[in-house]
């Protein structure tokens, strides 16, 4: 009897061990597969993951929810602070903002009116301004694709914002003697792209013989600057850069807003971003006018598609590339530039859409560091938009700058013999010229490629009522902050 009970207990133990072993065998693969599924989910949309991953929006949002009433109180308190040093970061990221210097990046693309917007900063006496310094990098690394250069652009931007211009030595043309000091060791101001129109370079103290003082508002004549202002060592320009309370850099070669997140999180930079948009049809019209000057840049933008099927679909849509049956046709020489410009614009519109959705989902601290501006609003209401821009940047208003902005939008005509030369333009012509100069097929192509971004930016399709109307409620990509900035 006792032996039977002992055998029964041993049998129960064995059965229990067998059940536990079976459960372990079932759970281990399930856990491992779950981890792999999570990785697959992260890789499901790699393009969006690259953008959203760096922001850590969910973590930032969770941090904001934990702050609750404290974050709201901080925002209310920030509204009462001096506009010179606004409180722009909530406790969600725990950043200590540097209040000694403000950095602004003007985020735009080619032919959107960014030169005019940048010139408004260039004219302000409290601003140290650089015009498209990343041009040097693109020229040195051509031919490349825009996407692979984004990290290098960000690193270059970080150095320039810190008034460290030694990075330019990596990309300066080796055969340009004017760009180097007599000892050939250091660069000079002549190494900077468009240095002849820079207000700091073309005015005292760097240029004692300049016809205008730094505080005097007015366009710099490039030939006059070259004649009166011999190049000086780049170290002297770095010293001047450190004196200014606001540093502004305008460029058109950074495609994704998400690339700037490490800089926005850097408490030592105190960075804000002004992103400029323009009706894609007007952009395309302007790009066609200056097609040869933009050909290299368009190729670099379009090369980002060579790694995907969409690039081949673009080729087929334009009647070139491999077709079923193995037949292919080379691109005709005449419309080659137009083809590259059209394809590049499609890539740009996709980047716009990513930026708009990206900023729309950003936490509150980041939205307060981002200003969305449409070119049409800037040229139609220059004074109002200038006040909005200066308030966002922490800069004082100037009557002379107000008059300058108004005069620059009241020119005699839109067309110019020098498409890359800044001059006064007719604002109405600048807004509506595409209607008369683009064919119906060209308009159709642009609207088909850019429809999602156009909808978020409140640009109506051709044939619809209105033109560049203000975004309707519920369609704005970003919420307004207390200042009305988006």
From Swiss-Prot:
GO CC list: Golgi membrane; membrane
Record's compositionally biased regions (Acidic residues): 476-486
Enzyme class: transferase
Cytoplasmic side: 1-13
Catalytic activity: chondroitin beta-D-glucuronate + n 3'-phosphoadenylyl sulfate = chondroitin 6'-sulfate + n adenosine 3',5'-bisphosphate + n H(+)
Topology, Lumenal side: 35-486
Disordered: annotated span: 66-92, 459-486
Compositional bias per record (Polar residues), positions renumbered to this chain: 80-90
Keyword Transmembrane helix in annotation: yes
Record-listed 3'-phosphoadenylyl sulfate binding positions: 110-116, 278-286
Residues where Phosphoserine is found: 462
Keyword Cytoplasm in record: no
Residues that span the membrane, as ranges: 14-34
Similarity section: Belongs to the sulfotransferase 1 family. Gal/GlcNAc/GalNAc subfamily.
Task performed by this protein: Sulfotransferase that utilizes 3'-phospho-5'-adenylyl sulfate (PAPS) as sulfonate donor to catalyze the transfer of sulfate to position 6 of non-reducing N-acetylglucosamine (GlcNAc) residues. Preferentially acts on mannose-linked GlcNAc. Also able to catalyze the transfer of sulfate to position 6 of the N-acetylgalactosamine (GalNAc) residue of chondroitin. Also acts on core 2 mucin-type oligosaccharide and N-acetyllactosamine oligomer with a lower efficiency. Has weak or no activity toward keratan sulfate and oligosaccharides containing the Galbeta1-4GlcNAc.
Protein name: Carbohydrate sulfotransferase 7
Organism listed in the record: Homo sapiens
